[in-house]
Amino acid sequence: MKIIRAKNYQDMSRKAANIISAQVIMKPDCVLGLATGGTPVGTYAQLVDWYNKGDLDFSEVTTVNLDEYRGLPKEHPESYWSFMHRNLFDHVNIDPAHINLPDGTNMDAEAECKRYDEVIRSVDGVDLQLLGIGHDGHIGFNEPHDAFDLGTHCVDLTQETIEANKRFFDGNVDLVPKQAYTMGDRKSTRLNSSHRCIS
């Protein structure tokens, strides 16, 4: 593992964007595993800037997102589908058919988890996975104590996570979804990734 130190958030965002852009340039049809939350916003802004300058081409890129709230329509402003479109997808030339997120409106958890694991397998895994680490060490909606061999699964959000996320829902804890779909670390899915960028 290589540790890259950053002076501040802006520096970290640029360094993470450098890693992603190098992957896209080196393998134009790469599969990027993407994350949401406050941490990658600056990284996505840098990628959009480079795209606008003609330095990046996302036309062959496929993306697989880490997680999505269960029960939240994708058009909801706080769905991760909306987040990704607002911060990246709507600003670059990615093919909408190459964008993959868990379907938060599918209330059949077993079927949705199987479907998303199959999506990941169908693209031969992830070339580069962008991850953020939460305040308590969670990655995606995987808590630190969760089993390491899970594929995509449905989780009940901890009260701590619900409290932390209420800032996105007008400070109202009752509006925060109580469950989510999240990728796990099972080798047949995400651990195919050859590189990870954890910020």
Model-inferred region functions:
Residues 1-32, 110:
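N-terminal glycine-/serine-/threonine-rich phosphate-binding loop
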Residues 136, 140-185:
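Class I SAM-dependent methyltransferase SAM-binding "motif I" and its flanking Rossmann-like core
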Residues 26-52:
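Glycine-rich N-terminal segment of FAD-binding domains in flavoprotein oxidoreductases
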Residues 30, 38-43, 118-144:
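A glycine-rich beta-strand to alpha-helix segment
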Residues 46-57, 80-82, 144-154:
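A glycine- and small-aliphatic-rich helix-loop capping segment at beta-alpha/alpha-beta transitions
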